[in-house]
Regions:
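Long, low-complexity or tandemly repetitive, helically biased scaffold regions used
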Residues: 3-163
């Protein structure tokens, strides 16, 4: 969600530009929501597979039973709540963007012809897009961390499943 320069001006074209700007941010946010859901599911499935592999290995090597218990306890304490919280915040941001777009659409074109109205609304839109950009950076980092966790879990699963 990179910032699109604030459009100056007034009238219906200005209003359309603001709506397009918010629509771009909304599309990006929806893509992040899909990625969060995918990674959350992947992490849960991999954690389950790692625990099952560790338990199976514990049957052949009794000392690995303790490792299985440790993994289960660690996973229980470190549930991917960070992804759940990020998803909730992203859903809230999506609602805010959808409301902003709806309000802009309801704004009479006559009101967009006044420079003072455009300046006030434009300033609010710039703040909103700025916060969207900040959230996008945070979501990108979070998704990167989730991807790293997935890679570590995959490697651990392979290690535990080996001979």
């Amino acid at each position: 969600m990179s910032a699109i320069p604030t459009q100056h001006g007034s009238g219906p074209a200005w209003k359309s530009g603001q709506i397009a700007r918010l629509g771009t941010a909304l599309d990006s946010l929806c893509g992040a929501l899909v990625a969060i859901d995918k990674q959350y599911g992947e992490i849960i499935a991999l954690r389950r597979a790692v625990c099952e592999s560790a338990r199976a290995l514990g049957k052949r090597r009794p000392h690995m039973t303790e490792v299985a218990h440790l993994l289960e306890a660690t996973f229980a304490l470190t549930a991917p709540a960070h992804l759940s919280m990020a998803r909730r915040l992203a859903v809230e941001m999506r609602c805010i963007l959808e409301q902003a777009i709806a309000r802009l659409r309801e704004l009479p074109d006559a009101d967009t012809s006044r420079e003072s109205s455009c300046r006030i609304v434009g300033s609010a839109m710039a703040d909103l897009v700025h916060h969207c950009d900040e959230n996008a950076v945070a979501l990108s980092k979070l998704l990167g961390n989730a991807e790293h966790e997935i890679q570590v879990l995959q490697a651990l699963f392979v290690e535990l499943s080996g001979p």
